[in-house]
Amino acid sequence: MDWHSTVRFPGESADYRAARDALLAAERDLRQQVEQVAELRRKLPLGGELPEDYGFEEGAADLADTATVVRGRLSDLFREGLDTLALYNFMYGPAMKQACPMCTSFLDSLDGTAPHAAQRLNLAVVAKSPIERIREFARARGWHNLRLLSSAENTYNRDYHGETAEGGQLPVLSLFVRRGGKIYHSYSTELVYAPAEPGQNQRHIDMMWPLWNLLDLTPEGRGADWYPRLSY
């Protein structure tokens, strides 16, 4: 349906309005394409069944509790009535001197989103470091809403392509679904493995990352070589 905006802002020129209307048409096309891609994602057939019920370590819900260590299974991450699990692979391996700044920036925002997301799905963050080290970092960041897991004693990261053969960590978000008492892989952000366009990185989770979406609205954009840091 043909549609034209009647909105006008103070002092805008005819050139501005013509360019903005063209951009608005492109934004509407993008909005439609985003939904079309989301529909394709929703219609994916079931992926492979979980090869094993991976065991993880986690601490108490209260990050101030530094003594409690709980051992559980991936199946335990599913709550009653919620049959989808999103599991983010946090690049913080035992050989890394510090956590990945990019992952950290993403998780800073996900921590705020988590209480809302929890109404619709199960959400957790997994890293290869020992659970005590993961929680210490989370305390320093002020994360209070993320369920943090250590995969130090299992092969989850390797099996689901969040770890290289040399032990390097990759920032993959994977989704699993529970069907009839079994757990299946549903989706992973495989765009992280695809070649990036010139002047870009893989942008595999950018749709979920407020920082980049905000910067994309600005005349300056993201910047050619700017990336989040652990501190400023």
Regions found by a protein language model. Give the residues of each.
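Thiol-based oxidoreductase modules, predominantly thioredoxin-like and allied folds used
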Residues: A114-R133, H144-T155
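Non-globular targeting/processing and membrane-anchoring segments
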Residues: M1-L85, F90-P115, Q119, F137-A140, ...
